Regions:
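Short proline/glycine- and basic residue-enriched helix-capping loop/turn segments at helix->loop/beta transitions
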Residues: 1-27, 52-82
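A short acidic/small-residue loop/turn micro-motif
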Residues: 13-14, 43-49
């Protein structure tokens, strides 16, 4: 399973102002056409700060087409310094 496009998540403005960093572990399912058919947060630190933006970003990801749907996990990191 090879990514074609994995746009970075948007940084929540309130977290950026506060200098908050964190990580979100997302489970995602890639459909046969390479689009994301399902996604959910498995773990987030800090809780509920970056969840929405992580899921919004993952929904825009695209992979090369696959023979059968594939479920995988990815960690998205948020760091106000870049």
């Amino acid at each position: 399973m090879r990514p074609i496009s994995t746009p970075a998540p948007r940084y929540p403005p309130e977290a950026l102002r506060a200098g908050t960093s964190g990580e979100v572990l997302v489970e995602l399912t890639v459909g046969t056409d390479g689009s994301i058919t399902a996604s959910r947060v498995l773990r987030a630190h800090p809780p509920r700060v970056f969840d929405r933006e992580a899921l919004n970003a993952v929904k825009r990801w695209r992979f090369e087409p696959v023979a059968a749907p594939v479920t995988t996990r990815r960690t998205l990191s948020f760091n106000p310094g870049g």
